[in-house]
Curated annotation (Swiss-Prot):
Binding site for L-serine: T226, S227, E228, E280, T379
Gene Ontology biological process terms, A to Z: selenocysteine biosynthetic process; seryl-tRNA aminoacylation
Organism: Mycobacteroides abscessus (strain ATCC 19977 / DSM 44196 / CCUG 20993 / CIP 104536 / JCM 13569 / NCTC 13031 / TMC 1543 / L948)
Name of the protein in its database record: Serine--tRNA ligase
Gene designation: serS
Record InterPro entries: aa-tRNA-synt_IIb, aa-tRNA-synth_II, aa-tRNA-synth_II/BPL/LPL, Ser-tRNA-ligase_type_1, Ser-tRNA-synth_1_N, SerRS_1_N_sf, SerRS_core, tRNA-bd_arm
Protein backbone atom coordinates (compact mmCIF):
# COMPACT_ATOMS: atom_id res chain seq x y z
CA UNK A 1 0.00 0.00 0.00
CA UNK A 2 1.15 3.53 -0.65
CA UNK A 3 2.36 5.88 2.08
CA UNK A 4 -0.64 7.84 3.41
CA UNK A 5 1.50 10.73 4.60
CA UNK A 6 2.93 11.05 1.08
CA UNK A 7 -0.59 10.89 -0.37
CA UNK A 8 -1.94 13.63 1.90
CA UNK A 9 1.02 15.91 1.16
CA UNK A 10 1.39 15.06 -2.56
CA UNK A 11 -2.00 14.04 -3.98
CA UNK A 12 -1.13 15.42 -7.42
CA UNK A 13 1.98 13.22 -7.60
CA UNK A 14 -0.15 10.14 -6.90
CA UNK A 15 -2.71 11.22 -9.51
CA UNK A 16 0.11 11.66 -12.03
CA UNK A 17 1.40 8.17 -11.20
CA UNK A 18 -2.05 6.71 -11.77
CA UNK A 19 -2.24 8.41 -15.17
CA UNK A 20 1.22 7.12 -16.16
CA UNK A 21 0.04 3.62 -15.35
CA UNK A 22 -3.17 4.08 -17.33
CA UNK A 23 -5.15 3.73 -14.11
CA UNK A 24 -7.92 5.90 -12.66
CA UNK A 25 -6.62 9.09 -10.96
CA UNK A 26 -10.06 9.58 -9.38
CA UNK A 27 -9.18 6.75 -6.98
CA UNK A 28 -6.94 9.24 -5.19
CA UNK A 29 -9.94 11.36 -4.23
CA UNK A 30 -11.83 8.25 -3.16
CA UNK A 31 -8.98 7.32 -0.82
CA UNK A 32 -8.61 10.86 0.55
CA UNK A 33 -12.35 11.00 1.29
CA UNK A 34 -12.26 7.54 2.87
CA UNK A 35 -9.28 8.59 4.99
CA UNK A 36 -11.12 11.72 6.18
CA UNK A 37 -14.25 9.70 7.02
CA UNK A 38 -12.23 7.07 8.87
CA UNK A 39 -10.34 9.63 10.95
CA UNK A 40 -13.59 11.43 11.79
CA UNK A 41 -15.21 8.15 12.85
CA UNK A 42 -12.23 7.27 15.04
CA UNK A 43 -12.32 10.71 16.67
CA UNK A 44 -16.07 10.49 17.31
CA UNK A 45 -15.79 7.00 18.81
CA UNK A 46 -12.85 8.03 21.02
CA UNK A 47 -14.70 11.12 22.28
CA UNK A 48 -17.84 9.14 23.10
CA UNK A 49 -15.84 6.43 24.90
CA UNK A 50 -14.17 9.12 27.02
CA UNK A 51 -17.59 10.60 27.86
CA UNK A 52 -18.88 7.12 28.70
CA UNK A 53 -15.96 6.53 31.06
CA UNK A 54 -16.55 9.87 32.78
CA UNK A 55 -20.28 9.13 33.09
CA UNK A 56 -19.55 5.76 34.71
CA UNK A 57 -17.43 7.50 37.35
CA UNK A 58 -20.27 9.95 38.05
CA UNK A 59 -22.73 7.09 38.55
CA UNK A 60 -20.39 5.51 41.09
CA UNK A 61 -20.23 8.74 43.10
CA UNK A 62 -23.89 9.75 42.69
CA UNK A 63 -26.46 10.02 45.44
CA UNK A 64 -29.54 7.79 45.25
CA UNK A 65 -31.52 10.77 43.95
CA UNK A 66 -29.02 11.52 41.16
CA UNK A 67 -28.46 7.91 40.09
CA UNK A 68 -31.57 7.27 37.88
CA UNK A 69 -30.91 10.27 35.63
CA UNK A 70 -27.21 9.46 35.38
CA UNK A 71 -27.95 5.81 34.55
CA UNK A 72 -30.31 6.91 31.79
CA UNK A 73 -27.63 9.23 30.39
CA UNK A 74 -25.04 6.44 30.62
CA UNK A 75 -27.36 4.07 28.76
CA UNK A 76 -27.83 6.65 26.01
CA UNK A 77 -24.05 7.12 25.80
CA UNK A 78 -23.55 3.35 25.56
CA UNK A 79 -25.90 3.25 22.57
CA UNK A 80 -24.04 6.14 20.95
CA UNK A 81 -20.68 4.41 21.52
CA UNK A 82 -22.01 1.21 19.94
CA UNK A 83 -23.26 3.14 16.92
CA UNK A 84 -19.98 5.08 16.60
CA UNK A 85 -17.92 1.90 16.79
CA UNK A 86 -20.08 0.30 14.09
CA UNK A 87 -19.52 3.37 11.91
CA UNK A 88 -15.79 3.12 12.58
CA UNK A 89 -15.80 -0.49 11.33
CA UNK A 90 -17.63 0.57 8.16
CA UNK A 91 -15.27 3.47 7.46
CA UNK A 92 -12.19 1.34 8.18
CA UNK A 93 -13.37 -1.25 5.64
CA UNK A 94 -14.05 1.42 3.01
CA UNK A 95 -10.67 3.00 3.68
CA UNK A 96 -8.81 -0.32 3.39
CA UNK A 97 -10.55 -1.12 0.11
CA UNK A 98 -9.71 2.33 -1.29
CA UNK A 99 -6.11 2.08 -0.05
CA UNK A 100 -5.58 -1.29 -1.74
CA UNK A 101 -7.03 0.02 -5.02
CA UNK A 102 -4.12 2.40 -5.67
CA UNK A 103 -0.93 1.00 -7.17
CA UNK A 104 2.55 1.95 -6.05
CA UNK A 105 3.75 5.42 -7.00
CA UNK A 106 6.11 5.13 -9.96
CA UNK A 107 9.63 6.51 -9.62
CA UNK A 108 10.58 9.64 -11.56
CA UNK A 109 11.98 8.72 -14.96
CA UNK A 110 9.85 5.63 -15.58
CA UNK A 111 8.56 5.88 -19.17
CA UNK A 112 4.85 6.42 -19.76
CA UNK A 113 2.77 4.02 -21.82
CA UNK A 114 2.24 0.29 -22.16
CA UNK A 115 4.12 -2.88 -23.06
CA UNK A 116 5.77 -1.48 -26.20
CA UNK A 117 6.71 1.90 -24.69
CA UNK A 118 9.76 0.77 -22.71
CA UNK A 119 13.03 2.69 -22.74
CA UNK A 120 16.06 0.78 -24.02
CA UNK A 121 18.93 0.92 -21.51
CA UNK A 122 21.47 -1.34 -23.17
CA UNK A 123 22.09 -3.88 -25.93
CA UNK A 124 24.54 -6.65 -25.04
CA UNK A 125 25.97 -8.87 -27.76
CA UNK A 126 24.99 -9.27 -31.39
CA UNK A 127 22.59 -11.96 -32.63
CA UNK A 128 24.69 -14.23 -34.84
CA UNK A 129 23.19 -15.47 -38.10
CA UNK A 130 21.79 -19.01 -38.04
CA UNK A 131 20.72 -20.54 -41.33
CA UNK A 132 17.29 -22.21 -41.04
CA UNK A 133 17.22 -22.14 -37.24
CA UNK A 134 15.16 -24.74 -35.39
CA UNK A 135 12.97 -23.59 -32.53
CA UNK A 136 13.51 -24.78 -28.98
CA UNK A 137 10.75 -27.38 -29.21
CA UNK A 138 12.21 -29.10 -32.26
CA UNK A 139 15.69 -28.93 -30.73
CA UNK A 140 14.56 -30.10 -27.32
CA UNK A 141 12.66 -33.08 -28.67
CA UNK A 142 15.39 -34.13 -31.12
CA UNK A 143 17.97 -33.93 -28.32
CA UNK A 144 15.73 -35.74 -25.82
CA UNK A 145 15.62 -32.75 -23.47
CA UNK A 146 11.89 -32.49 -22.91
CA UNK A 147 8.65 -34.21 -23.75
CA UNK A 148 5.69 -31.94 -24.44
CA UNK A 149 3.34 -34.72 -25.59
CA UNK A 150 3.59 -36.75 -22.41
CA UNK A 151 3.44 -33.60 -20.30
CA UNK A 152 0.08 -32.81 -21.91
CA UNK A 153 -1.06 -36.43 -21.51
CA UNK A 154 -0.33 -36.38 -17.78
CA UNK A 155 -1.31 -32.81 -16.83
CA UNK A 156 -2.83 -30.98 -19.81
CA UNK A 157 -1.76 -28.07 -21.99
CA UNK A 158 1.30 -25.99 -21.01
CA UNK A 159 2.87 -28.84 -19.02
CA UNK A 160 6.00 -30.79 -19.95
CA UNK A 161 8.63 -33.25 -18.77
CA UNK A 162 12.29 -32.21 -18.66
CA UNK A 163 14.26 -35.35 -19.49
CA UNK A 164 17.89 -36.42 -19.41
CA UNK A 165 20.23 -33.58 -20.27
CA UNK A 166 17.24 -31.21 -20.26
CA UNK A 167 16.77 -31.81 -16.55
CA UNK A 168 20.53 -31.53 -15.97
CA UNK A 169 20.67 -28.29 -17.95
CA UNK A 170 17.95 -26.71 -15.82
CA UNK A 171 19.43 -27.98 -12.56
CA UNK A 172 22.85 -26.69 -13.59
CA UNK A 173 21.41 -23.30 -14.45
CA UNK A 174 19.64 -23.04 -11.10
CA UNK A 175 22.70 -24.27 -9.18
CA UNK A 176 24.84 -21.67 -10.94
CA UNK A 177 22.31 -19.01 -9.93
CA UNK A 178 22.48 -20.19 -6.32
CA UNK A 179 26.28 -20.11 -6.36
CA UNK A 180 26.22 -16.60 -7.81
CA UNK A 181 23.76 -15.44 -5.15
CA UNK A 182 25.60 -17.01 -2.21
CA UNK A 183 28.93 -15.60 -3.44
CA UNK A 184 27.33 -12.15 -3.33
CA UNK A 185 26.07 -12.44 0.24
CA UNK A 186 22.59 -13.89 -0.28
CA UNK A 187 21.12 -16.44 2.12
CA UNK A 188 19.60 -19.39 0.26
CA UNK A 189 16.01 -20.32 1.09
CA UNK A 190 13.86 -23.17 -0.20
CA UNK A 191 10.45 -21.78 0.76
CA UNK A 192 6.97 -23.29 0.94
CA UNK A 193 5.04 -22.87 -2.30
CA UNK A 194 1.63 -22.71 -0.61
CA UNK A 195 0.89 -19.45 1.22
CA UNK A 196 -1.93 -17.86 3.19
CA UNK A 197 -4.23 -15.24 1.61
CA UNK A 198 -2.73 -12.41 3.66
CA UNK A 199 0.74 -13.18 2.30
CA UNK A 200 -0.40 -13.48 -1.31
CA UNK A 201 -2.47 -10.31 -0.95
CA UNK A 202 0.31 -8.51 0.88
CA UNK A 203 2.64 -8.90 -2.08
CA UNK A 204 0.04 -7.50 -4.47
CA UNK A 205 -0.90 -10.67 -6.36
CA UNK A 206 -4.60 -10.74 -5.46
CA UNK A 207 -5.54 -7.53 -7.25
CA UNK A 208 -6.26 -7.17 -10.95
CA UNK A 209 -4.43 -10.42 -11.77
CA UNK A 210 -5.92 -12.64 -9.07
CA UNK A 211 -7.26 -14.98 -11.77
CA UNK A 212 -3.64 -15.87 -12.62
CA UNK A 213 -3.18 -17.53 -9.22
CA UNK A 214 -4.01 -21.12 -8.31
CA UNK A 215 -6.21 -21.27 -5.20
CA UNK A 216 -6.89 -24.35 -3.05
CA UNK A 217 -10.35 -23.40 -1.80
CA UNK A 218 -10.70 -26.17 0.77
CA UNK A 219 -7.51 -25.12 2.54
CA UNK A 220 -7.65 -21.42 1.58
CA UNK A 221 -4.05 -21.52 0.41
CA UNK A 222 -2.47 -20.18 -2.77
CA UNK A 223 0.20 -21.72 -5.00
CA UNK A 224 2.92 -19.13 -5.56
CA UNK A 225 3.90 -17.87 -9.00
CA UNK A 226 7.31 -16.81 -7.64
CA UNK A 227 9.27 -17.32 -4.42
CA UNK A 228 9.08 -13.54 -4.04
CA UNK A 229 5.75 -14.22 -2.29
CA UNK A 230 6.85 -16.49 0.58
CA UNK A 231 10.12 -14.59 1.04
CA UNK A 232 8.21 -11.30 1.30
CA UNK A 233 6.16 -12.96 4.02
CA UNK A 234 9.24 -14.41 5.74
CA UNK A 235 9.69 -11.29 7.89
CA UNK A 236 6.05 -10.14 7.96
CA UNK A 237 5.14 -8.47 11.25
CA UNK A 238 8.81 -8.16 12.25
CA UNK A 239 11.23 -5.32 12.97
CA UNK A 240 14.49 -5.97 11.12
CA UNK A 241 18.04 -4.98 11.94
CA UNK A 242 19.31 -3.23 8.80
CA UNK A 243 22.15 -1.37 10.49
CA UNK A 244 24.69 -3.63 8.78
CA UNK A 245 23.08 -3.28 5.36
CA UNK A 246 20.29 -4.97 3.39
CA UNK A 247 19.03 -8.50 4.06
CA UNK A 248 19.40 -10.51 0.85
CA UNK A 249 17.73 -13.86 0.18
CA UNK A 250 17.71 -16.19 -2.82
CA UNK A 251 14.70 -18.47 -3.10
CA UNK A 252 14.69 -21.70 -5.13
CA UNK A 253 11.19 -22.96 -5.81
CA UNK A 254 8.74 -24.39 -8.26
CA UNK A 255 6.33 -21.71 -9.48
CA UNK A 256 2.73 -22.04 -10.68
CA UNK A 257 0.73 -19.73 -12.94
CA UNK A 258 -2.71 -20.22 -14.46
CA UNK A 259 -1.86 -18.02 -17.48
CA UNK A 260 -5.56 -17.17 -17.62
CA UNK A 261 -4.96 -13.97 -19.57
CA UNK A 262 -2.65 -15.48 -22.17
CA UNK A 263 -5.02 -17.60 -24.25
CA UNK A 264 -3.44 -18.19 -27.65
CA UNK A 265 -0.05 -16.73 -26.65
CA UNK A 266 3.10 -18.86 -26.73
CA UNK A 267 1.12 -22.08 -26.92
CA UNK A 268 4.15 -23.95 -28.29
CA UNK A 269 6.99 -25.00 -26.04
CA UNK A 270 8.13 -23.88 -22.60
CA UNK A 271 8.06 -20.10 -22.86
CA UNK A 272 4.69 -19.73 -21.12
CA UNK A 273 3.78 -22.69 -18.92
CA UNK A 274 1.80 -23.51 -15.80
CA UNK A 275 4.74 -24.85 -13.78
CA UNK A 276 8.42 -23.96 -13.84
CA UNK A 277 11.40 -23.60 -11.53
CA UNK A 278 13.16 -20.40 -10.59
CA UNK A 279 15.82 -18.86 -8.38
CA UNK A 280 14.63 -15.46 -7.21
CA UNK A 281 16.64 -12.73 -5.50
CA UNK A 282 14.79 -10.84 -2.76
CA UNK A 283 16.07 -7.89 -0.74
CA UNK A 284 14.90 -5.99 2.34
CA UNK A 285 16.59 -2.61 2.75
CA UNK A 286 16.13 0.96 3.96
CA UNK A 287 14.06 3.02 1.48
CA UNK A 288 16.96 5.36 0.76
CA UNK A 289 19.06 2.36 -0.37
CA UNK A 290 16.43 0.84 -2.67
CA UNK A 291 17.42 2.43 -6.00
CA UNK A 292 21.09 1.49 -5.56
CA UNK A 293 20.06 -2.02 -4.56
CA UNK A 294 17.90 -2.23 -7.68
CA UNK A 295 20.94 -1.59 -9.85
CA UNK A 296 22.89 -4.24 -7.94
CA UNK A 297 20.22 -6.88 -8.57
CA UNK A 298 20.26 -5.96 -12.26
CA UNK A 299 24.04 -6.41 -12.20
CA UNK A 300 23.74 -9.92 -10.75
CA UNK A 301 21.12 -10.80 -13.36
CA UNK A 302 23.46 -9.57 -16.10
CA UNK A 303 26.24 -11.68 -14.60
CA UNK A 304 24.03 -14.76 -14.94
CA UNK A 305 23.10 -13.86 -18.51
CA UNK A 306 26.80 -13.54 -19.29
CA UNK A 307 27.25 -17.13 -18.13
CA UNK A 308 24.78 -18.45 -20.73
CA UNK A 309 26.40 -16.44 -23.54
CA UNK A 310 23.31 -15.10 -25.33
CA UNK A 311 22.61 -11.65 -26.83
CA UNK A 312 20.18 -9.63 -24.73
CA UNK A 313 18.86 -6.17 -24.08
CA UNK A 314 18.00 -4.32 -20.87
CA UNK A 315 14.80 -2.27 -20.81
CA UNK A 316 13.19 0.17 -18.39
CA UNK A 317 9.61 -1.09 -18.35
CA UNK A 318 6.86 1.47 -19.03
CA UNK A 319 4.51 2.46 -16.21
CA UNK A 320 1.48 0.83 -17.81
CA UNK A 321 3.26 -2.53 -17.88
CA UNK A 322 4.29 -2.51 -14.21
CA UNK A 323 2.65 -4.73 -11.63
CA UNK A 324 0.76 -2.91 -8.90
CA UNK A 325 3.59 -3.36 -6.37
CA UNK A 326 6.46 -2.17 -8.56
CA UNK A 327 7.59 1.46 -8.65
CA UNK A 328 10.16 0.62 -11.33
CA UNK A 329 11.11 -2.54 -13.20
CA UNK A 330 14.05 -3.49 -15.40
CA UNK A 331 13.76 -6.49 -17.72
CA UNK A 332 16.54 -8.37 -19.46
CA UNK A 333 15.28 -9.89 -22.70
CA UNK A 334 17.27 -12.47 -24.67
CA UNK A 335 17.30 -12.82 -28.43
CA UNK A 336 15.25 -15.79 -29.68
CA UNK A 337 16.34 -16.51 -33.27
CA UNK A 338 13.24 -18.31 -34.53
CA UNK A 339 10.97 -15.54 -33.26
CA UNK A 340 13.36 -12.81 -34.39
CA UNK A 341 12.48 -11.05 -31.16
CA UNK A 342 13.77 -10.40 -27.67
CA UNK A 343 11.90 -12.29 -24.93
CA UNK A 344 11.97 -11.64 -21.21
CA UNK A 345 14.36 -13.81 -19.19
CA UNK A 346 14.74 -11.69 -16.06
CA UNK A 347 12.75 -9.04 -14.30
CA UNK A 348 13.81 -6.97 -11.30
CA UNK A 349 11.39 -4.71 -9.46
CA UNK A 350 11.84 -1.97 -6.89
CA UNK A 351 8.68 -2.19 -4.78
CA UNK A 352 9.79 0.64 -2.44
CA UNK A 353 7.72 0.39 0.78
CA UNK A 354 4.54 -0.86 -0.92
CA UNK A 355 4.75 -4.57 -0.01
CA UNK A 356 6.41 -4.06 3.36
CA UNK A 357 3.66 -1.67 4.46
CA UNK A 358 1.01 -4.30 3.76
CA UNK A 359 3.06 -7.00 5.46
CA UNK A 360 4.17 -4.81 8.41
CA UNK A 361 7.90 -5.28 7.80
CA UNK A 362 9.84 -2.54 9.58
CA UNK A 363 13.34 -1.58 10.69
CA UNK A 364 14.62 0.86 13.31
CA UNK A 365 16.05 4.17 12.15
CA UNK A 366 19.00 5.92 13.82
CA UNK A 367 16.76 7.22 16.60
CA UNK A 368 15.36 3.74 17.27
CA UNK A 369 11.96 4.52 15.77
CA UNK A 370 10.36 1.77 13.64
CA UNK A 371 10.03 2.66 9.93
CA UNK A 372 8.65 0.76 6.93
CA UNK A 373 11.32 -1.17 5.01
CA UNK A 374 11.69 -1.37 1.22
CA UNK A 375 11.59 -4.62 -0.77
CA UNK A 376 13.04 -5.58 -4.15
CA UNK A 377 13.06 -8.76 -6.20
CA UNK A 378 14.69 -10.14 -9.34
CA UNK A 379 15.06 -13.32 -11.40
CA UNK A 380 18.45 -15.05 -11.29
CA UNK A 381 17.49 -18.07 -13.43
CA UNK A 382 14.36 -19.89 -14.57
CA UNK A 383 13.15 -22.65 -16.89
CA UNK A 384 12.47 -20.22 -19.75
CA UNK A 385 16.21 -19.60 -20.10
CA UNK A 386 16.50 -23.02 -21.79
CA UNK A 387 14.74 -21.51 -24.80
CA UNK A 388 17.46 -18.89 -25.31
CA UNK A 389 20.28 -21.35 -24.62
CA UNK A 390 19.04 -23.95 -27.10
CA UNK A 391 18.19 -21.57 -29.92
CA UNK A 392 21.29 -19.38 -29.69
CA UNK A 393 23.76 -22.25 -29.31
CA UNK A 394 22.37 -24.60 -31.96
CA UNK A 395 24.84 -25.94 -34.52
CA UNK A 396 24.32 -26.76 -38.24
CA UNK A 397 24.32 -30.52 -37.48
CA UNK A 398 21.40 -30.18 -35.04
CA UNK A 399 23.54 -30.34 -31.91
CA UNK A 400 23.63 -27.63 -29.23
CA UNK A 401 26.78 -26.28 -27.59
CA UNK A 402 26.52 -26.11 -23.81
CA UNK A 403 27.60 -22.71 -22.42
CA UNK A 404 31.03 -23.09 -20.80
CA UNK A 405 29.79 -22.16 -17.31
CA UNK A 406 27.19 -24.96 -17.42
CA UNK A 407 29.46 -27.76 -18.68
CA UNK A 408 30.51 -28.89 -15.14
CA UNK A 409 26.84 -29.26 -14.19
CA UNK A 410 25.66 -30.95 -17.39
CA UNK A 411 28.69 -33.19 -17.88
CA UNK A 412 29.14 -32.62 -21.60
CA UNK A 413 30.16 -29.79 -23.91
CA UNK A 414 27.73 -30.65 -26.70
CA UNK A 415 24.19 -32.03 -26.71
CA UNK A 416 23.87 -34.45 -29.63
CA UNK A 417 20.66 -35.47 -31.45
CA UNK A 418 19.23 -38.80 -30.34
Amino acid sequence: MIDLKFLRENPDAVRASQRLRGEDPALVEVLLDADTARRAAISTADTLRAEQKAASKKVGKATPEERPALLAAASELAAQVKSAEAEQVVTEAAFTEAHKAISNVVIDGVPAGGEQDFALRELVGEPHPIENPKDHVELGESLGLFDMERGAKVSGARFYFLTGYGALLQLGLLQLAVQTAVANGFTLLIPPVLVKPEIMGGTGFLGAHADEVYHLEEDDLYLVGTSEVPIAGYHSGEILDLNNGPLRYAGWSSCFRREAGSYGKDTRGIIRVHQFDKVEAFVYCKPEDAEAEHEKILGWERQMLGHIEVPYRVIDVAAGDLGSSAARKFDCEAWVPTQRAYRELTSTSNCTTFQARRLAVRYRDESGKPQIAATLNGTLATTRWLVAILENHQQPDGSVRVPTALVPFVGTEVLEPK
